[in-house]
Amino acid sequence: MKVEKKDIYTHIILYNNDPKDDLKKQIDSFSIDMDNLIIDIKNQNINKVQLVLSFLKHATLWKKKNKSFILVVNDSKIDYDKEIICLPTLDEAVEYLYMEELERNV
Protein backbone atom coordinates (compact mmCIF):
# COMPACT_ATOMS: atom_id res chain seq x y z
CA MET A 1 0.00 0.00 0.00
CA LYS A 2 1.21 3.47 -0.84
CA VAL A 3 -0.15 6.60 0.86
CA GLU A 4 0.51 10.04 -0.62
CA LYS A 5 -0.67 13.31 0.91
CA LYS A 6 -1.60 15.84 -1.77
CA ASP A 7 -2.81 19.43 -1.43
CA ILE A 8 -6.51 18.76 -0.65
CA TYR A 9 -6.65 14.97 -0.56
CA THR A 10 -4.86 11.80 0.39
CA HIS A 11 -4.23 9.21 -2.32
CA ILE A 12 -4.05 5.55 -1.27
CA ILE A 13 -2.95 2.89 -3.73
CA LEU A 14 -3.81 -0.66 -2.79
CA TYR A 15 -1.66 -3.30 -4.44
CA ASN A 16 -2.78 -6.86 -5.08
CA ASN A 17 -0.80 -8.42 -2.22
CA ASP A 18 -1.87 -5.83 0.39
CA PRO A 19 -4.17 -7.10 3.15
CA LYS A 20 -7.58 -5.42 2.91
CA ASP A 21 -7.71 -5.11 6.71
CA ASP A 22 -4.64 -2.84 6.63
CA LEU A 23 -6.45 -0.55 4.22
CA LYS A 24 -9.53 -0.40 6.46
CA LYS A 25 -7.34 0.49 9.46
CA GLN A 26 -5.64 3.20 7.40
CA ILE A 27 -9.01 4.63 6.34
CA ASP A 28 -10.26 4.55 9.92
CA SER A 29 -7.21 6.55 11.00
CA PHE A 30 -8.04 9.18 8.36
CA SER A 31 -11.60 9.49 9.67
CA ILE A 32 -10.19 11.54 12.56
CA ASP A 33 -8.88 14.31 10.29
CA MET A 34 -11.46 13.71 7.55
CA ASP A 35 -9.22 14.49 4.61
CA ASN A 36 -10.64 13.92 1.13
CA LEU A 37 -9.66 10.41 0.02
CA ILE A 38 -8.97 8.85 -3.34
CA ILE A 39 -8.42 5.12 -3.04
CA ASP A 40 -6.99 3.29 -6.04
CA ILE A 41 -8.12 -0.35 -6.10
CA LYS A 42 -7.78 -0.95 -9.84
CA ASN A 43 -4.81 -3.31 -9.27
CA GLN A 44 -6.91 -5.72 -7.21
CA ASN A 45 -7.56 -9.15 -8.73
CA ILE A 46 -10.54 -9.90 -6.52
CA ASN A 47 -14.25 -9.28 -6.79
CA LYS A 48 -14.23 -5.49 -7.10
CA VAL A 49 -17.98 -5.17 -6.57
CA GLN A 50 -17.66 -6.80 -3.17
CA LEU A 51 -14.62 -4.66 -2.31
CA VAL A 52 -16.39 -1.45 -3.37
CA LEU A 53 -19.45 -2.32 -1.29
CA SER A 54 -17.21 -2.87 1.73
CA PHE A 55 -16.35 0.87 1.54
CA LEU A 56 -19.96 2.05 1.59
CA LYS A 57 -19.93 2.81 5.33
CA HIS A 58 -16.79 4.92 4.96
CA ALA A 59 -18.13 6.76 1.91
CA THR A 60 -21.31 7.65 3.79
CA LEU A 61 -19.30 8.97 6.74
CA TRP A 62 -17.12 11.14 4.49
CA LYS A 63 -20.17 12.50 2.67
CA LYS A 64 -21.80 13.49 5.99
CA LYS A 65 -18.66 15.48 6.83
CA ASN A 66 -18.67 17.23 3.41
CA LYS A 67 -15.57 15.42 2.23
CA SER A 68 -14.93 13.34 -0.87
CA PHE A 69 -14.40 9.58 -0.82
CA ILE A 70 -13.59 8.33 -4.31
CA LEU A 71 -12.56 4.90 -5.54
CA VAL A 72 -10.50 4.36 -8.68
CA VAL A 73 -11.79 1.14 -10.20
CA ASN A 74 -11.15 -0.12 -13.73
CA ASP A 75 -14.43 -2.03 -13.90
CA SER A 76 -17.07 -0.39 -16.08
CA LYS A 77 -19.82 -2.54 -14.55
CA ILE A 78 -19.58 -0.70 -11.24
CA ASP A 79 -22.09 2.14 -10.93
CA TYR A 80 -23.62 3.02 -7.58
CA ASP A 81 -25.60 6.17 -8.37
CA LYS A 82 -23.45 8.43 -6.20
CA GLU A 83 -23.78 6.32 -3.06
CA ILE A 84 -20.11 5.73 -3.62
CA ILE A 85 -18.09 7.44 -6.35
CA CYS A 86 -16.19 5.02 -8.62
CA LEU A 87 -14.15 6.34 -11.51
CA PRO A 88 -11.83 4.52 -13.94
CA THR A 89 -8.70 6.70 -13.67
CA LEU A 90 -6.85 8.78 -11.11
CA ASP A 91 -7.08 11.86 -13.35
CA GLU A 92 -10.87 11.59 -13.45
CA ALA A 93 -10.98 11.06 -9.68
CA VAL A 94 -8.89 14.18 -9.02
CA GLU A 95 -10.99 16.22 -11.44
CA TYR A 96 -14.20 15.00 -9.78
CA LEU A 97 -12.81 15.83 -6.34
CA TYR A 98 -12.01 19.40 -7.40
CA MET A 99 -15.53 19.78 -8.83
CA GLU A 100 -17.01 18.60 -5.52
CA GLU A 101 -14.80 21.06 -3.63
CA LEU A 102 -16.05 23.89 -5.86
CA GLU A 103 -19.68 22.87 -5.25
CA ARG A 104 -19.13 22.78 -1.50
CA ASN A 105 -17.56 26.24 -1.53
CA VAL A 106 -20.41 27.84 -3.51
Please provide the spans of the model-predicted regions.
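Amphipathic, Lys/Arg-enriched alpha-helical "gate/interface" segment within cytosolic domains
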Residues: 2-106
